[in-house]
Amino acid sequence: MEWSREIYTFYINFEVVSLVPPSFEVLPDPQVIFTVENLGVILASFLLISAVAHFVIAFVRNKNYNENLKKGMNPYRWYEYAFSSSIMIVLIAQFLGIWDLWSLVMIFVLNATMIMFGYLMEKINQYPKKTDWSPYLLGCISGFTPWIVMAAYFIAALGSGETEPPTFVYLILLIYFIMFNTFSINMILQYKGINKWKDYLYGERVYIILSLIAKTALAWLVFIRIFASF
């Protein structure tokens, strides 16, 4: 697929203006570190991570998986999401115009941290009668931050008189903000024990379906964007 993004660093340089009196300027110095290409490989990566995780759960760690389900937890889910969803959100960030290397690193880490708070939520709430929502709330903070940053870039693009974000950008921002939050809603329904979510296994099935939809939808949206240019 013909697609590429140059990834920058924005370190600063100090330029001496005069020695007497001492004076200098601080100037940003954007440098291209590398170019992200091979979009097909990136799209395949999070799908492959998910496939490998499901293979391991089904054939290698199935006994542990079933034992954990009885305790109301699935750590393997969170391990997989920490990588696959973080790759997804970094890719989305690049489509929205975030090309600074360290901003992308922070987005990846913040998203992965949010996911591991989900793991912690299940781990510490296996047995208590009263649910401890601290990991959930902390996860919301770390997980919501990248979306604030991406929304800021999107709004800045809207405010520019020279450019207009393509329809694809509107779609991907809206669809994936909704998709990412459905995972959070699923967790709330599980721990509140609402209707069918009283059964932990029902929530587990919902996670599997949501994961499949999110990954497949992103892959197709990107494919359509590249070939149809909408």
Which residues are covered by each model-predicted region?
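Polytopic alpha-helical membrane-helix bundles and their juxtamembrane interface segments
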Residues: 1-74, 85-230
